[in-house]
Design a protein with these regions (language model features):
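Mid-domain alpha/beta scaffold segments of enzyme catalytic cores
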Residues: 1-257
Length: 257
């Protein structure tokens, strides 16, 4: 029993074998996944994919890279998409100062707007933050993001950010980065994170875990993240226990019965 909380199944790299990718995930024990929107078009695509498969859910929103493209009618379009029963989250949203594909000031403004929208439509948020920890936390606090909660996806921050996220009532989601050779500090944070606040993801097709580095990532590989978590916790927690608990956590966050 596994729940991949962050996939990009609309990505063109799956166009030739999307059904086979999803079938492999199911065969490997992945019970469900959330496919993520990064702008209006990909949010619509996420909803379409979720309608096609009963075990796939969708998240809608605008990634910080893409906020410079937001048009006046987008938020109303998101309000309409949010009415679909398969939409379980708003995101991925946040701040990314590494690439600055959108100007930092505009990122912050749009982040606030999107938190406000998530609160209005009562959806938990999927947060992306890179080299913007303090601003991300400050804005989440100021905009009362805890009212709906959410998850820091693909967590790769430090212990300070982990504590701030947990204090806000958010979950931490760990990806294939956890398996990388140079991720010892992150593994320590994962070990210290309460299991009932832990999620797992692939962020596929990105961030392929060891031992599949160099290949396209896919949801079936989320088992490698669960295995790494079990290894981190040692004999006290089995792979099966990790799978059961993180799946329960995902269903609780996304209000999936």
């Amino acid at each position: 029993m596994l729940f991949d909380t962050h996939v990009h199944l609309d990505d063109a790299r799956y166009n030739d074998d999307r059904d086979a990718v999803i079938a492999r995930a199911r065969e490997s024990g992945v019970e469900a996944f959330v496919t993520i929107g990064c702008d209006l078009a990909t949010s619509g695509a996420a909803v379409e994919i979720a309608e096609r498969y009963p075990f796939v859910y969708a998240s809608i929103g605008v990634h910080p890279h893409e906020v410079k493209h937001i048009q006046d009618d987008w938020y109303n379009e998101f309000r309409c998409l949010a009415k679909n029963k398969n939409v379980v989250a708003y995101g991925e949203i946040g701040l990314d100062y590494h690439y600055n594909h959108s100007a930092p000031k505009e990122q912050r403004e749009r982040f606030r707007e999107q938190i406000q929208l998530a609160r209005e439509i009562k959806l938990p948020m999927i947060i992306h933050t890179r080299e913007a920890q303090e601003d991300t936390v400050s804005i989440l606090r100021e905009e009362k993001a805890s009212d709906v909660g959410g998850v820091f996806h693909c967590f790769s921050g430090d212990a300070w950010l982990a504590k701030q996220a947990l204090d806000l009532g958010f979950y931490l989601s760990f990806s294939g980065i956890l398996t990388f050779h140079n991720s010892t500090p992150l593994r320590e944070i994962a070990k210290a994170t309460p299991l009932d606040r832990t999620l797992i993801e692939t962020d596929c097709p990105y961030l392929t875990p060891v031992p599949y580095r160099g290949k396209r990532n896919e949801p079936s590989y989320v088992s490698r993240v669960a295995q790494q978590l079990a290894s981190i916790h040692g004999p006290t927690l089995s792979f099966e226990q990790i799978g059961v608990q993180t799946t329960e956590n995902a269903k609780r966050l996304f209000r999936i019965s």
